[in-house]
Curated annotation (Swiss-Prot):
<keyword id="KW-0372">Hormone</keyword>
<keyword id="KW-0225">Disease variant</keyword>
<dbReference type="InterPro" id="IPR036817">
    <property type="entry name" value="Transthyretin/HIU_hydrolase_sf"/>
</dbReference>
<keyword id="KW-0597">Phosphoprotein</keyword>
<feature type="modified residue" description="4-carboxyglutamate; in a patient with Moyamoya disease">
    <location>
        <position position="62"/>
    </location>
</feature>
<keyword id="KW-0622">Neuropathy</keyword>
<dbReference type="GO" id="GO:0001523">
    <property type="term" value="P:retinoid metabolic process"/>
</dbReference>
<dbReference type="GO" id="GO:0042562">
    <property type="term" value="F:hormone binding"/>
</dbReference>
<dbReference type="Pfam" id="PF00576">
    <property type="entry name" value="Transthyretin"/>
</dbReference>
<dbReference type="GO" id="GO:0003105">
    <property type="term" value="P:negative regulation of glomerular filtration"/>
</dbReference>
<dbReference type="GO" id="GO:0070062">
    <property type="term" value="C:extracellular exosome"/>
</dbReference>
<dbReference type="InterPro" id="IPR023418">
    <property type="entry name" value="Thyroxine_BS"/>
</dbReference>
<feature type="modified residue" description="Phosphoserine">
    <location>
        <position position="72"/>
    </location>
</feature>
<keyword id="KW-0732">Signal</keyword>
<comment type="similarity">
    <text>Belongs to the transthyretin family.</text>
</comment>
<keyword id="KW-1008">Amyloidosis</keyword>
<feature type="binding site">
    <location>
        <position position="137"/>
    </location>
    <ligand>
        <name>L-thyroxine</name>
    </ligand>
</feature>
Amino acid sequence: MASHRLLLLCLAGLVFVSEAGPTGTGESKCPLMVKVLDAVRGSPAINVAVHVFRKAADDTWEPFASGKTSESGELHGLTTEEEFVEGIYKVEIDTKSYWKALGISPFHEHAEVVFTANDSGPRRYTIAALLSPYSYSTTAVVTNPKE
């Protein structure tokens, strides 16, 4: 249990460090950013497919955005402030394809984060995932763009 807390603390620290300054892409103002780290190799997880869905009024998931992580393990530009309205969103990270490309047979098909966004006004969300073949941890950093 203590090791899980330490792992989450380290992951949160990595997210805060990455938020401290702009990334190489200069897109630090995007309302939704995903960062994926490889816990086995101790490096950013590159070319990981990420799919974002928005929950519809009939409780189905509608595709919202998608992309792949960069050399820094980050994915920016998924949406704009105008499109990223209040609602329930699901971020799905394709862990299976990532590990298979490295010759590893993983347990999970994907890592999934479901969250309510912008219910307290516009916010910026960084969803971070720390991956290993048989587990994953996620955390989020939510900031007010006006602060």
